Regions:
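Short, flexible loop segments at boundaries between secondary-structure elements
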Residues: 148-154, 194-230
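A short, gly/pro- and small-residue-rich
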Residues: 64-72, 181-200
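N-terminal nucleotide/polyanion-binding subdomain common to many enzyme families
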Residues: 1-96
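Proline-aspartate-enriched helix->loop->beta-strand connector
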Residues: 163, 167-173, 177, 193
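A transmembrane-helix-recognition feature enriched in membrane-embedded lipid enzymes
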Residues: 83-86, 213-262
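Conserved beta-alpha
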Residues: 83-162, 166
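Short glycine-rich anion-binding loops that position phosphate/pyrophosphate groups of nucleotides
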Residues: 53-57, 175-180, 202-203
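Structural motif
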Residues: 49-51, 76, 170-174, 197
Length: 262
């Protein structure tokens, strides 16, 4: 194996992970993630999840503070870039693509316990519609509170207090990275919620504000290309410049003595 692999135990579940640079990415399937979330809720133990794509890791490689934040979380893989990284460094892909747009609905549909859910992020209209979608599609769960992701730093104390007053089991934070992961980690001691997950644009998809890529793009791992075609100016730097940079970073890891285990 070219990459360092790890095994550890989290909430009574055996977790295998592969190192991509300084980041240990869990080699999980959806059912494993569901088991983790359920165990954390039942045991009232903290579980903070960051769903990482190539852009996430590249951003963290450029920002030591963000890197330190991610290293305090349970990291899951998202997208073809991460699959490529695993193939290059471990000689096999991750067992499943755990992008949040698919993973969160699978958790809500298949978890064995009812959840009290708080939604934080996106615009007011989008998060409200996401609440309605969850309540309609997954009626065994209760959305106990929600608010948009536009708040000032001096509102953090009251925001965390308001979240805690709803007694949630699951906090979904949709503010993009690095902001959503930074919020979770920096406010963890003030939050009385066992599970917190950064979910990116999930509320935009749930509300219908953003159209998801057609199935053919999803199956081919090319959702990023569809998004680039829809928003070329906003996403040009992320994909057209970011993808080659990520590939170069992977090659450095592969051939670096500090990143290779033989």
């Amino acid at each position: 194996m070219l990459a360092r692999d790890f095994e550890s135990e989290l909430l009574g579940c055996r977790i295998e992970a592969t190192a991509i640079g300084p980041f240990a990415i869990g080699r999980l399937r959806s059912r494993d993630a569901i088991q983790l979330v359920e165990a954390a809720v039942q045991k009232r133990q903290n579980l903070d999840i960051a769903i990482c794509n190539a852009h996430t890791l590249l951003s963290a490689m450029d920002d030591p503070r963000y890197a330190a934040t991610l290293q305090k979380m349970t990291l899951l893989n998202d997208g073809i870039g991460m699959s490529l990284a695993s193939k290059l460094l471990r000689e096999e892909p991750f067992p499943e693509n755990l992008n949040g747009t698919d993973l969160i609905p699978r958790i809500l549909a298949n978890i064995g316990i009812p959840l009290r859910i708080y939604l934080l992020g996106a615009k007011e209209e989008q998060v409200r519609l996401a609440k309605e979608h969850i309540e309609t599609a997954y009626p065994k769960h209760q959305v106990v509170g929600y608010r948009d992701g536009y708040f000032a730093s001096d509102e953090l104390d009251s925001l965390c207090q308001g979240i805690n007053e709803t007694k949630p089991d699951l906090l979904l934070v949709a503010m993009g990275n690095p902001r959503q992961e930074t919020f979770i980690v920096e406010n963890r001691s003030a939050l009385a919620v066992p599970v917190a997950i950064g979910v990116g644009a999930l509320f935009d998809f749930m509300s219908g504000a953003v159209v998801r890529a057609p199935k053919i793009f999803q199956a081919a791992g090319l959702e990023w290309l569809f998004r680039l075609l829809q928003e070329p100016r906003r996403l040009f730097r992320r994909y057209v410049i970011g993808i080659p940079r990520f590939l170069f970073a992977l090659m450095k890891i592969r051939f670096s003595r500090s990143g290779v285990s033989r």
